[in-house]
Amino acid sequence: MTEGAKSTIDQGEVDRFSAMAAEWWSPTGKFKPLHKFNPVRLAYIRDKACENFSRDPKSARPLEGLRVLDIGCGGGLLSEPVARMGASVVGADPSEKNIGIASTHAKASGVSVDYRAVTAEGLAEAGETFDIVLNMEVVEHVADVEFFMTTCAKMVRPGGLIFVATINRTMKAAALAIFAAENILRWLPRGTHQYEKLVRPEELEEPLVASGLEITDRTGVSFNPLSNQWNLSKDMDVNYMLLAKRPT
């Protein structure tokens, strides 16, 4: 198979998320965990981006003037707040239904986001480049992780960043992020995650490094049931985020 014939799309995953599209903006619906997760990942994105681009994280629009890609944007839970930080955001998703929901919500909220029903490879082939690429809770749903990461890396400008958040492929993650989250706590619909599609950090880092990027940060993300909040942690056995930079 030639590289041009490759695809990052797992159509079954696209169809499953399309079927739930109307629930994206319900904080008590099927995407409740993402609503809970949003504050910690937004703070991480803001702080690391400001550190890299010499911005003030306390300013009202700290990402002003930066072009950001939110790949696999879903209903726009991340795209909208990043746009509110001043960034020029392209929200990309292969699901027309997701893009429809995201576009409608952004318009109603008065937020400007360039939503497109397009794949990562479609954007890369068009020569699109960005200061920041957000790859959050997506890699565990794609068809070819290595090709997906390589494709996303191509779109990172010199001096730019790529953020990745996903679930580690460990027995601890299988117990907590799949069995407990889907079957006991019912945080997620059954079948949201499949163990064999979870991704270890090195499986993300290798194609990024091979694409000329440098891994600059890794962090775990853990849920505190007492505070009912997600926090950064040293434990990367379940949820984790990593950051890579293309040298100038």
Curated annotation (Swiss-Prot):
Example GO biological process: methylation
Positions bound to S-adenosyl-L-methionine: 41, 72, 93, 136
Keywords: Methyltransferase, S-adenosyl-L-methionine, Transferase, Ubiquinone biosynthesis
Keyword S-adenosyl-L-methionine set for record: yes
Domain of life per record: Bacteria
Catalytic activity annotation: a 3-demethylubiquinol + S-adenosyl-L-methionine = a ubiquinol + S-adenosyl-L-homocysteine + H(+); a 3-(all-trans-polyprenyl)benzene-1,2-diol + S-adenosyl-L-methionine = a 2-methoxy-6-(all-trans-polyprenyl)phenol + S-adenosyl-L-homocysteine + H(+)
Broadest EC class assigned to this enzyme: transferase
Enzyme Commission identifier(s): 2.1.1.222, 2.1.1.64
Gene Ontology molecular function: 2-polyprenyl-6-hydroxyphenol methylase activity; 3-demethylubiquinol 3-O-methyltransferase activity; polyprenyldihydroxybenzoate methyltransferase activity
InterPro entries reported for this sequence: SAM-dependent_MTases_sf, UbiG_MeTrfase
SUPFAM superfamilies in the cross-refs: S-adenosyl-L-methionine-dependent methyltransferases
Biological or metabolic pathway of the protein: Cofactor biosynthesis; ubiquinone biosynthesis
Chain's role: O-methyltransferase that catalyzes the 2 O-methylation steps in the ubiquinone biosynthetic pathway.
Protein family: Belongs to the methyltransferase superfamily. UbiG/COQ3 family.
UniProt protein name: Ubiquinone biosynthesis O-methyltransferase
Gene: ubiG
